[in-house]
Amino acid sequence: MPYRISRQAYAETYGPTTGDRIRLADTDLILEVEKDYTVYGDEVKFGGGKVIRDGMGQSQTPRAEGAVDTVITNALILDWWGIVKADVGLKDGRIVGIGKAGNPDTQEGVTIVVGPGTEAIAGEGHILTAGGIDTHIHFICPQQIETALASGVTTLMGGGTGPATGTNATTCTPGAFHIGRMLQAAEGLPVNLGFFGKGNASTPEALEEQVRAGACGLKLHEDWGTTPATIDACLSVADRMDVQVCIHTDTLNEAGFVEDTIAAIKGRTIHTFHTEGAGGGHAPDIIKICGEANVLPSSTNPTRPYTRNTLEEHLDMLMVCHHLDPKIPEDVAFAESRIRRETIAAEDILHDLGSFSIIASDSQAMGRVGEVITRTFQTAHKMKVQRGALPEDSARNDNHRLKRYIAKVTINPALAHGISSEVGSIETGKLADLVLWKPGFFGIRPELVVKGGSIVWAQMGDANASIPTPGPVHGRPMFGAFGKALAPSCLTFVSEAAMDADIQRQLGLERTCMAVRDTRSVGKSALKLNSALPKVSVDPQTYEVFADGELLTCEPAEVLPLAQRYLLL
């Protein structure tokens, strides 16, 4: 007779299985396991008296004959494509298997071979996600990298040169000299990186020069002058050289209105930053651009989600970031024109409908680099509380909503910037950039971060203790973030033109450089679970937002999960 075990005992031993449900941290979000790829009775688990031992769950297979370098056992995967329980095999820094790990000589259904050269990471009782991707980084200080990594973000794209006044306001690394220096600085940083050149020019020569120098995209920012002429010139260069264009539009409507910007874009693919407008953009109606099929709309996290504190904190942030003077009435009026409770409230709902597709930080330039994933799932929680279950979900779980929101910080930014062949999801062949979470800390504090197959960050106790767990336990960098282990675990994203110019040799780079690809053919329809195209309008007097004729409004949150309950400061 087979041995029978209660569901509770099974979950405590091997993690949850099909039909089990998990509450995520202190949110109201419920996840349900859709499928279990492990085999009952043949599960693998490491430890004294456990399964991964010689002749049992561990085979004699050497690495050269197919054994993996690392197995993550019994992990609960949350990704845009599904919520499944599986073992995950890693080899040469990449994901090579999602299924059943073990010894094919003694176990049934093995698709991931464990051998003497295999390391084990216990995933049972944990949630596994792809490393987060933040595509709105002001590279103001290198300390942002550690803060982002500690939050579960493993890829950062944006612009800047350090705490220069231009960088404090705009996500641009202007010119070949600065792009080269930032590519060299990336050598010592344990995340994937890509840098945007300045896109504000009316003629192509200086833009092409930056792309050849290693820019993986171009950024149009109103502080440098985002006019119809610069928009057209920048997109024309991008179309020829296959890089993405990101845009922060003209808040003051000096060179035109949102309709003029849409006309200048001419149906070409473009990534619109902080599309609601508080972070900058045509006042008061830039938000309507999210209904365009060629527009990839994102939010930055200071407006995620709408709370009773959102409006109050924005004015001071604006004055500092954009080099404004509170003693000049016109500067104050400029700042105040960007802050509208009506459009911020509508932004929450447009995310829940899948019309806004991406969430990023706007690091140290009105946004918080370590809160991208936190703010994303705070928004999901708020929308469940205020709007109830999505039509695709049931009373049992919020699976569709969870897939929609995880896509906003993983696969969709990867698709938008031409890097989805390498990162953005848990799929075979992709870089093993993975984040392991305890369910009680999901979205706020990762337990372990794997970068290119090596552990780069983990919750760790006192280094002088006799075991790893005594306090103080906090996130610390691990071996994968040090020495020569760093370079092979990370990618630097550049243009194809930079690869053709052999930028790696020119600058003496040790990290692998990868060209972004297919950035000009991606439209909103390609973005996973976030491709809705409502017809959006804004009342110019009241700022009320309508989607397909329906008023979009919600109350600000008075209290949020994933907040002070988890943080001492």
UniProtKB/Swiss-Prot annotation:
Cofactor, free-text remark: Binds 2 nickel ions per subunit.
Positions bearing N6-carboxylysine: K219
GO function terms (MF aspect): nickel cation binding; urease activity
Urease domain mapped to chain residues: 131-569
PANTHER family on file: UREASE
Family: Belongs to the metallo-dependent hydrolases superfamily. Urease alpha subunit family.
Protein name (record): Urease subunit alpha
Organism: Synechococcus sp. (strain CC9605)
